[in-house]
Amino acid sequence: MRYNTQESQPQTSICKVVGFFDFQQLWRKKEGLKPKQIIEQVRMLHGVHINYKQAWRVREEAQILVRGTPEDSYYNLSRWLYKITETNPGSLTYQHVDAAGKFKYAFVAFGPSIRGFSLMRRVIAVDGTFLKGKFNGTLLAACAQDGNYHLYPLAFAVVDAENGASWKWFFRGLSQKIPDASDLVFVSDRANSISSALEDVYPLSHHGICRIHLLRNITPTYAKTGLLPLVESAADAYTCHEFWLIFKDIKDKCPELAKYLEESDFRKWARSYAPANRYNIMTTNIAESLNSMLKMPRELPIISLLETIRLTMTTWFFERREAAAKHKHLVTPKVVQKLVSRLGAAMLLNVYQVDRSEFEVKDETMKFVVDLEKRHCTCNVFDIDKIPCIHAIAAAKHIKRDENRFVDASHLTETWAKAYAESIHPGGELSTSTYPENIDELSCPPPATKKKSGRPPTKRKRSVGEFGVPGSKSQSHKCSRCGTGGHNKITCQRPIG
């Protein structure tokens, strides 16, 4: 009997036998081996020559051994959700089916994370990203930022698509743990589905739009005006006076752009006009960075995807808890860096004390009023960032006070440690656990999907304004006729005059 030739056994048998060896690799490496690596490994270890298609099937077989089939993952989802709530008290999970009883939505918010949010600045960035597995779908995420400016995940949902109904369902779940309030801020892209859902579920909260998405929207029409840096500066301005100095310049140079920005509502994109404090969170980067981190897990069955998120959060909570315990400074490491970077400029200012807590601080051209007790400066940086500006630092140094004492409680090391004080626990092995009878009654089949023609996408389409690294495949290209992006000289319809 021959054991070392491809003809000695059927294709499927090769996949099952060799899949065991890749199975071992998958335990040590999240993404497993690439098909080309599998071809080489099988040739070297077993003397069997397989082609790329067979190697791909080997990889799929190995992933099934590790993670189960995508179909089984949906059937077992109710068990996984139950175990998470059992091992992590205060967690919230939901599962929703369609009219045919098939999976439609799933929601997860871990109790330790939700409780930790009560110690943080009340700004939540939300974003969605498509899933790349057999049944497609979309992952919705809500994230905050901790006192050390780290990403802090709050809630997730797997839904059929990113639309008004799914966002409303997601926000309804989130509102069970984070109620509506006037000091709560959501930051997102300009999708109408998010806006309408927030208006319905969180009417008291403020909805701000991401500065980067605003710039992407105006790039196709106004990039050649050279005013995009001014728009960015206007969005980031701390005072209305500073905002209007910049906006007047925009209006004088391009009235059409100024009109568009006015119609976009200053309160949504300009920090100085926001009715609730956005602090430093002017973009959805914290949510998008999470989606980027989950690039590979988005291909996995639903339980493996959610388990990857859980494991990531478990690791983050442990590592950051340890880091906070070792950090001996009053304020978090990133805030220490900010204050140190401002110290040099602060020492060049002239300070005049008005009373016990009020000071007049002057530079070469302007003067500012600082009230250390009220944690206020007329530059508004102290008020919004909740960290002493250069003027407040100068005032504190003038009376020999430690500027760290005037940092907001959300940035204290003690608060940072409390946010990660609890652990996020694994749910345990599903096959050996016991469950209440009603849990298996909630089991549902996977969603019905319509397979699209052609190869399924693994990358989202980039919007205008997302430029690649020079020399890379993702680099943007400009029309050789008119010099703008988005088309080539063959399809160019711009008048040249």
Annotated model-derived regions:
Residues M1-G32, P456-T458, S463-V464, V469-K473:
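Basic, short loop/linker segments at the boundary and entry of helix-turn-helix/winged-helix-like folds
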Residues R2-V18, K30, K134-F135, F156-P179:
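Active-site beta-loop-alpha junctions of metal-dependent nucleic acid enzymes
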Residues R43-K53:
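Short, basic interhelical loop/turn and adjoining N-cap
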Residues N51, I64-D72, N76-F117, S175, ...:
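Hydrophobic, aromatic-enriched, well-ordered structural segments
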Residues A55, C389, K489-R494:
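Cysteine-centered loop/knuckle micro-motif
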Residues V108-P112, M120-L131:
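Two-metal-ion RNase H-like nuclease active-site motif
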Residues G116, K134, T138-H150:
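Short conserved beta-strand segments at catalytic cores or DNA/RNA-binding microdomains
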Residues H376-D383, H477-H487:
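Short Cys/His-rich zinc-binding micro-motifs
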